[in-house]
């Protein structure tokens, strides 16, 4: 399966594919191209996956002919969530940041005959948007079957709280289309098998002293600690909870992400 990863960031969807391959050894994929507007994200993606062609081009410039030439069988995407966030202006499709998504839905999905699978991730609230309405209508018109989810990583054994909307779609007509959002995974057998090996705490997700990483680069100085210690959201390796990082992480002290501290196995806060 040849995959096109759009709004690719640092490669989260690609990592998800690799995780799925551990459980489904016969599952084969090839991410043939990744596209994101952020130069910084693209540099990180290239570091993580040096064999993937990474582009900083405008998604609105993609054509059905190009995707057919690349024989794209699947599109994985995480479109900008700002037009749909509950804290934002909720301009939906009137927000210019929705234009690349609309181009995908209106120009690419209906006209790329090789396309058989779609995976989309977005913020909670997308499911109530006009953009969502346009997406599911297009999928139905193009003979896709789809299922939608509102789930949090903690439900999958991952120590992070980040409720998100997911949609999976396929042209496989044997796929059972759901008539409502799924938020309870307790009865999903595949979920039980795939994530039972996951760590329940942060220990396996953080850097250790023997990693090629200089801790001095990210240590908080006494001035910052003295001013903001009471609002820091502190976690340790044994913590079973974390929240997502925002763009303001490193600039603002409160509500932008977790601070990790590791001093032996204990911490005392005055």
Regions picked out by a protein language model, each given a short descriptive name:
Residues 254-257:
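Cytochrome P450 core scaffold surrounding the K-helix E-X-X-R motif
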Residues 1-115, 124-130:
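Core alpha/beta nucleotide-donor-binding catalytic domains of modification enzymes
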Residues 62-72, 84-252, 262-268:
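Class I S-adenosyl-L-methionine
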């Amino acid at each position: 399966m040849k995959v096109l990863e759009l709004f690719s960031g640092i490669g989260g969807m690609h990592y998800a594919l690799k995780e799925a391959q551990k459980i489904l050894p016969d599952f084969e994929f090839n991410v043939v191209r990744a596209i994101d507007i952020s130069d910084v994200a693209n540099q990180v993606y290239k570091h993580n996956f040096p064999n993937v062609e990474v582009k900083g081009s405008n998604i609105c410039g993609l054509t059905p002919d190009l995707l057919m030439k690349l024989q794209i069988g699947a599109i994985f995407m995480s479109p900008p969530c700002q037009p749909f966030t509950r804290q934002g202006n909720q301009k939906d499709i009137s927000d210019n940041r929705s234009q690349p998504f609309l181009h995908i839905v209106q120009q690419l999905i209906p006209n790329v005959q090789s396309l058989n699978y779609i995976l989309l991730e977005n913020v909670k609230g997308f499911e109530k948007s006009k953009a969502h309405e346009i997406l599911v209508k297009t999928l139905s018109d193009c003979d896709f079957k789809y299922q939608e989810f509102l789930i949090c990583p903690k439900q999958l054994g991952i120590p992070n709280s980040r409720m998100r909307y997911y949609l999976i779609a396929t042209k496989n007509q044997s796929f059972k289309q759901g008539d409502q959002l799924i938020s309870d995974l307790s009865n999903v057998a595949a979920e039980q098998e795939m994530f039972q090996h996951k760590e329940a705490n942060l220990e396996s997700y953080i850097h250790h002293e023997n990693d090629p990483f200089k801790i001095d680069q990210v240590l908080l100085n006494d001035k910052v600690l003295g001013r903001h210690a009471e609002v820091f959201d502190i976690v340790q390796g044994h913590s079973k909870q974390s929240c997502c990082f925002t763009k303001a992480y490193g600039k603002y002290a409160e509500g932008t992400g977790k601070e990790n501290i590791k001093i032996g196995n204990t911490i005392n806060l005055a």
